[in-house]
């Protein structure tokens, strides 16, 4: 009887299409790393997996299989099967995998088939698909010429990238804007999940037939998400285009990003009082994150201005007082740092211009 299995040659199609996948690994494995379109419905919970693994090391495969069957039986087995059936009722074309595409995949497939659901498992499982994605990242620079979008803080680089189909939004994947004030409301992904999502985005970009791979100018770390070494090296060697924007527009944009969006996000998640407190803490922690660069005296001045702006905002609903510390942050910290960094890239710069001019240049080149 032929094995109902999706071959490794299908990895690209599965990942690019966001094909639904049921991940039968234990929750601890799934939490460490998974794929964007996968959902965890385990064959074994964490403790069951640990016991079976210990048995395998001490007594061999058959003893481990027997223990697994004794642990997942009766009502427990039925509960797992019910969860799988609900998933495949919702996603009738989904696949399944375990870590290596081995015993767990085959047993899950067998139980589903006995319940009247015939589901293919993926050859090689998570491990082989993960390796495929690692190779995708390592080969990214050779697949499509990288082009780095630089620009002074507040110039709207992310908004610009999102308006184009030849870009990959690294900050969106990392859930962080890459600066001291760059934290999102939701937590950052694990390093493995960041890499997996990046690789899937690169595969989709390759399929778009874009002329180049447009990426925002980033440090090695975006928050706590580290760019893979080979990928970052490619970025450091790539040509650069520079987005320019007047100060007034930058201040308006940063007031919206640092104040309006963050404040409303915290309020939405935590309610009025707790949300405002969390927003105030976000600003305090962000400025403290650059205390060493600012120096103690200047840091204290920033904190005083921020506290005053928060008091005005809370009492009057007026956010305009925040402009003072944002403008100071640009002049004292971000702009000098940017100038130092862009000077080092001078020989790689191909074009400078505002949003409209940049779109026109990229479309023509």
Curated annotation (Swiss-Prot):
One of its GO terms (molecular function) is tRNA 2-selenouridine synthase activity. SMART domains: RHOD. Keywords: Selenium, Transferase. Residues 15-138 form the Rhodanese domain. SUPFAM superfamilies: Rhodanese/Cell cycle control phosphatase. InterPro entries: Rhodanese-like_dom (IPR001763), Rhodanese-like_dom_sf (IPR036873), SelU (IPR017582). GO terms for biological process: tRNA wobble uridine modification. It catalyses: 5-methylaminomethyl-2-thiouridine(34) in tRNA + selenophosphate + (2E)-geranyl diphosphate + H2O + H(+) = 5-methylaminomethyl-2-selenouridine(34) in tRNA + (2E)-thiogeraniol + phosphate + diphosphate; 5-methylaminomethyl-2-thiouridine(34) in tRNA + (2E)-geranyl diphosphate = 5-methylaminomethyl-S-(2E)-geranyl-thiouridine(34) in tRNA + diphosphate; 5-methylaminomethyl-S-(2E)-geranyl-thiouridine(34) in tRNA + selenophosphate + H(+) = 5-methylaminomethyl-2-(Se-phospho)selenouridine(34) in tRNA + (2E)-thiogeraniol; 5-methylaminomethyl-2-(Se-phospho)selenouridine(34) in tRNA + H2O = 5-methylaminomethyl-2-selenouridine(34) in tRNA + phosphate. It comes from the Bacteria. Its EC number is 2.9.1.3. It is an enzyme of class 2 (transferase). The active site is at residue 98. Belongs to the SelU family. Involved in the post-transcriptional modification of the uridine at the wobble position (U34) of tRNA(Lys), tRNA(Glu) and tRNA(Gln). Catalyzes the conversion of 2-thiouridine (S2U-RNA) to 2-selenouridine (Se2U-RNA). Acts in a two-step process involving geranylation of 2-thiouridine (S2U) to S-geranyl-2-thiouridine (geS2U) and subsequent selenation of the latter derivative to 2-selenouridine (Se2U) in the tRNA chain. Monomer. PANTHER family: TRNA 2-SELENOURIDINE SYNTHASE (PTHR30401:SF0). This is tRNA 2-selenouridine synthase. It comes from Shewanella piezotolerans (strain WP3 / JCM 13877).
